[in-house]
Amino acid sequence: MTFTELSTDLLADPVALLMSSFFTASNSSKAAGQAYIERLKLRVTDRDAPVSMMAAGAQLAAIREWGSISSADRYATLPRIHQRILIVHGSKDIVVIPINAFLLAQHLPDAQLVMYPDASHGAQSQHAEVFLQHARLFLDG
């Protein structure tokens, strides 16, 4: 399934949408998704504001604009970024397909790509413990 193939029924149910777009259909991924949902419920103070429809629309517009730029132009300025960058991605991401993470890593001179197996758009939540290890190694390096 791709992100654009998600049904309108899922769009009406935020938890179902999150589970379908951030986690895969495997039992281990579904279990990680449920654990993530439970972790979200634990924090009751100092929570981020929910994403507004306006913010979601602006993000989709930015994605569309990025996609309308020719491939050559899309990556032209990335080699000028010399900041260390950690790219975290799921091997089965349906929101941003994995090849895009590889392309990004190829065009950024100091990027490190970590691809998590059997993970969709919520790779860092599905593999939370190992992600924290990778993040610490990156930040300490």
Language model segments and positions:
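Short beta-strand/loop motif that positions the catalytic acidic residue
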Residues: I81, I87-H89, D93
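Conserved alpha/beta-hydrolase "acid-adjacent" motif
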Residues: I94-N100
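Active-site acidic short loop of glycosyltransferases
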Residues: H82-Q83, D110
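Alpha-helical elements of Rossmann-like donor-binding domains used by nucleotide-donor carbohydrate transfer enzymes
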Residues: L17, R39, A58-A62, A76, ...
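Conserved alpha/beta-hydrolase catalytic His-Asp/Glu region
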Residues: A16-A61, G67, S71
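Flexible "cap/lid" loop of the alpha/beta hydrolase fold
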Residues: M1-D13
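Catalytic active-site module of serine/aspartate enzymes centered on a nucleophile-bearing elbow/loop
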Residues: F102, L108-G141
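The feature captures the conserved acid-bearing segment of alpha/beta-hydrolase catalytic domains
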Residues: A72-R80
